[in-house]
Amino acid sequence: MPELPEVQTIVDYLNHHVLDIFIKKTIVHLPKILKNKTPQEFEKLLINHKIVKIKRLGKYLLFFLSNNLVLSVHLRMEGKFYYQAKEEWFNLAHTHIIIEFNNGMQLRYNDTRQFGTFHIYEQQSFLDSKELKKIALDPLDNNFSAQYLYEKLKKSNKAIKTALLDQSVVSGIGNIYADEILFAAKIFPTILAKNLTLKNYEKITKEAQRILLLSIKNKGTTIHTYKFGNDETGLFQKMLLVHTHAKEPCQICGTIIQKTKVNGRGTYYCPNCQN
C-alpha cells in the first residue's frame, strides 16, 4: 500500500500535469470504485470543470474541483494513476476509471486488486465525511509534535509498531516506514506505547519527519508494485536499513536483522540497536 511519501509523490506529479484543464468526459468501467455516486452522477459533476489543486490527507489524495467539490481517492493496495494521451495503449483489464481532458490527455485509474475508493463531497463539508474525519495528523503536519503523539499514546496498551500504523493516531505511516522509524529511534517494536517516555516520542517524531522527507525526496519506496507517473519507480528502497533485510547484518552494529510478526504485520528489527 502506498504510504505518505508515495502518495505525496503522486500528488506532486499530478499537480504538475492535470491542473486547470477542462474535463471533457469520464468513463467508469468498474462502478464499485465509486462509493457515493453512480457513474452518471460522477460524470455530470466532473465534465466542463477543472481540477484546481490536489492535496494529500494521510494516505488520501484530494482533488479540489472548480465547482467547489472534492474528489477523495484512496489507492489502497495497488491503485495507480497514469496521465497519458488518449491514443496511448493501456491495460484495459485493470483500468477502472478514466477522466478525459479537452487537451487529448486522459487520467487513468488502474487497480489490479480493485480495493481503491473514490468519494465526491462538497468542499465545505468533506472533512466531516466518515472516512476523513477520523484521519489524524501526520508527522509532516505543522501541528504534529512529540507531545501530540505522547498524549495520544500514553495510555495505549498497543505495541508501538501497531500504534504507529493506526491512522486515527498518526496518519500516513505504513509498515515500511514504521520499521525504519523505530530502528532509527532505537525502540523495540513490541514495547507497549504507554511505556514510552516523552523523550522516546521526541526521537520517534524526529526520525519520522527525517525519514519521510528523505523518502519524498527520493520519490518513495518501490518494493513490489508502487509506481508513479508513467511507470517510474521510487528510489528509497535502496536506503532501507531494516525493512526487507532479514538475516542480513545490521548496517550499524553488524547484528543479524530479525523478522517477526507484530499484530499480524511482518516486522524487521535489530535486536541489538533496538534493545
Curated annotation (Swiss-Prot):
Pfam families: Fapy_DNA_glyco, H2TH, zf-FPG_IleRS. DNA binds at H94, R113. InterPro entries: DNA_glyclase/AP_lyase_DNA-bd, DNA_glyclase_Znf_dom_DNA_BS, Formamido-pyr_DNA_Glyclase, FPG_cat, MutM-like_N-ter, Ribosomal_uS13-like_H2TH, Znf_DNA_glyclase/AP_lyase, Znf_FPG/IleRS. This is Formamidopyrimidine-DNA glycosylase. The active site is at P2 (schiff-base intermediate with dna), E3 (proton donor), K59 (proton donor), R265 (proton donor). The gene is mutM. It comes from Ureaplasma parvum serovar 3 (strain ATCC 700970). The keyword Zinc-finger applies. One of its GO terms (molecular function) is class I DNA-(apurinic or apyrimidinic site) endonuclease activity. It catalyses: Hydrolysis of DNA containing ring-opened 7-methylguanine residues, releasing 2,6-diamino-4-hydroxy-5-(N-methyl)formamidopyrimidine; 2'-deoxyribonucleotide-(2'-deoxyribose 5'-phosphate)-2'-deoxyribonucleotide-DNA = a 3'-end 2'-deoxyribonucleotide-(2,3-dehydro-2,3-deoxyribose 5'-phosphate)-DNA + a 5'-end 5'-phospho-2'-deoxyribonucleoside-DNA + H(+). One of its GO terms (biological process) is base-excision repair. Monomer. Signal peptide: none annotated. Involved in base excision repair of DNA damaged by oxidation or by mutagenic agents. Acts as a DNA glycosylase that recognizes and removes damaged bases. Has a preference for oxidized purines, such as 7,8-dihydro-8-oxoguanine (8-oxoG). Has AP (apurinic/apyrimidinic) lyase activity and introduces nicks in the DNA strand. Cleaves the DNA backbone by beta-delta elimination to generate a single-strand break at the site of the removed base with both 3'- and 5'-phosphates.
